[in-house]
């Protein structure tokens, strides 16, 4: 008789033991980075300046010297549409994670009710003043709850968590890309503005040269070939001015599209390209660990961990589930 009871209790003990275990997901192992462990040596790898700083230790505000560019980047981080969408995706992933995490715990509900009624004397058995019966009731229960014996719910919760973290890293990647694009467009606009001024000065000089040759031609000193060559130079310079004028307009439109709103004139670059492109001096040697800190790499690894957790949920689906 005792032996029969032992075998009857064995499945229950086994189920409780499984409930205390982890999940059926495989052990996650971080992939090895395909980079060299040491910094290469040779003539091409010169020593850095003593004042050079490591880029990994600097925030984006510390990289640029131009104050207008810094203010423009802050405006872009506030107004850019893609960055807003990335932030909304984070809120969505956070909500999904909270919903998935709630499945780990039972939902308990409680309800109470009271009723008091006064009866007249002719209906209360002749009691003076009537009767006042009272009724009270209370119910406590919980919604359907799955006993997570094989870690299916925990695996799904881990998957939702990793996807939420991957979304956060994707937002960081979008932010870094936005900073790089705005800085590049800013420098491109400054470069084209400098080229436009150079083209305008060249056109003015070519016109002056043409006028001089034209007077010489009228006096019979210069030949018609000299006059035509001077006229050709003027037309080439005029075409350069038109080309760079169009390029400046396109650069400004692209920059405003990145920022997300009209850019104030005081934040636009001038023709001083050297001042606009000034940056702090950075060290050339960057440790390979920086690759693991890149948001796009972090996001990819989080998605890999989410897929790893989903394997545990798929394995647990082969076993029976108990729902209370």
Per-segment meaning from a language model:
Residues 53-59, 127-130, 194-199:
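A ubiquitous short alpha-helical element
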Residues 153, 169-286:
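Periplasmic alpha-helical coiled-coil/stalk elements that build and connect Gram-negative outer-membrane
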Residues 17, 143, 185:
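Conserved Rossmann-like nucleotide-binding pocket used by diverse enzymes
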Residues 27, 38, 58-59, 65-75, ...:
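Small/polar-residue-enriched beta-strand and adjacent coil segments characteristic
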Residues 92-96, 234-237, 307:
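A short structural micro-motif
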Residues 3-9, 16-78, 157, 161, ...:
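Terminal intrinsically disordered/low-complexity segments used for targeting and assembly
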């Amino acid at each position: 008789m005792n032996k029969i009871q032992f075998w009857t209790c064995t499945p229950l003990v086994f189920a409780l033991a499984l409930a205390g275990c982890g999940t059926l997901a495989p052990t996650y192992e971080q992939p090895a980075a395909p980079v060299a462990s040491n910094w290469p040596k040779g003539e091409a790898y010169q020593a850095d300046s003593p004042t050079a700083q490591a880029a990994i230790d600097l925030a984006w505000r510390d990289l640029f010297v131009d104050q207008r560019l810094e203010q423009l980047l802050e405006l872009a981080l506030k107004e850019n549409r893609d960055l807003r969408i990335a932030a909304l995706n984070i809120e969505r992933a956070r909500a999904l994670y909270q919903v998935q995490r709630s499945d780990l715990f039972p939902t308990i509900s409680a309800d109470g009710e009271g009723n008091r009624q006064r009866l007249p004397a002719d209906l209360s058995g002749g009691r003076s003043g009537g009767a006042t019966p009272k009724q009270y009731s209370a119910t406590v229960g919980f919604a359907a709850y799955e006993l997570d014996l094989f870690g299916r719910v925990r695996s799904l919760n881990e998957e939702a968590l990793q996807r939420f973290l991957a979304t956060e890293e994707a937002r960081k990647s979008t932010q870094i890309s936005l900073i790089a694009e705005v800085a590049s467009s800013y420098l491109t606009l400054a470069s084209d503005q400098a080229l436009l001024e150079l083209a305008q000065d060249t056109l003015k000089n070519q016109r002056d040269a043409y006028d001089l040759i034209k007077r010489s031609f009228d006096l019979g000193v210069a030949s018609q070939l000299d006059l035509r060559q001077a006229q050709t130079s003027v037309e080439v310079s005029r075409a350069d001015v038109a080309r760079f004028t169009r390029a400046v307009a396109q650069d400004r439109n692209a920059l405003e599209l990145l920022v997300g709103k009209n850019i104030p004139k005081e934040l636009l670059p001038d023709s001083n390209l050297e001042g606009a492109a000034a940056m702090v001096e950075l060290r050339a040697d960057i440790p390979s660990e920086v690759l693991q800190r890149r948001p796009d790499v972090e996001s990819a690894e989080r998605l890999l961990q989410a897929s790893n957790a989903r394997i545990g949920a798929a394995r647990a689906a082969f076993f029976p589930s108990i729902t209370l």
